[in-house]
Amino acid sequence: MRALHVPAAGDKPQLGEIPTPDAAEGTVVIRVKAAGLNPIDNAVAAGMLVHMGLPHEYPLVIGRDAAGVVEAVGAGVDHVSVGDEVLGHVLLAPPISAGTLAEYAVLPAVAVTRKPAGLDFATAAALPLAGAAAVQSVDAIDPQPGQTVLVNGASGG
């Protein structure tokens, strides 16, 4: 499959062919229809994982967010099925190698949900990290009915 990836330590990202991922236990493989970009993607491409000493593997595919169609599900995955339209993100859980700027992406099942029918793939791909940040922020302050909440700097994850 084609993917934007870092082939080896010290290399710059390049578009090229890498093996298509398989679904392992607790994962979902999607055919990517759209992928979102976040500041973390540039940092990963620039070598952040190396500088932070985070375990990772090559080829290292760039990208965290995506929307697409389920191609395969691993054992233990029962909330989505082959053919479902979904959105999700790749967790930064070591060893890091998976990404979403590719024809196919393998995502942890816990980070995948069905795409609402009225939402296009491009919009859906922009939601996972930024949307999770928004939900976590609201959950953290636990607003009550009648309270006012100011959203400042809603620029995403």
Task: Tell where the protein language model's regions lie, with residue ranges.
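Conserved beta-strand elements of the Class I
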Residues: 4, 28-29, 150
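Conserved glycine-rich cofactor-binding loop
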Residues: 155
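Cytochrome P450 core scaffold surrounding the K-helix E-X-X-R motif
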Residues: 40-46
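A local structural motif
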Residues: 10-17
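Glycine-rich beta-strand-centered segment in the early N-terminal region that forms part
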Residues: 19-37, 49-93
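NAD(P)H dinucleotide-binding glycine-rich loop of Rossmann-like/cofactor-binding domains
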Residues: 79, 88-152
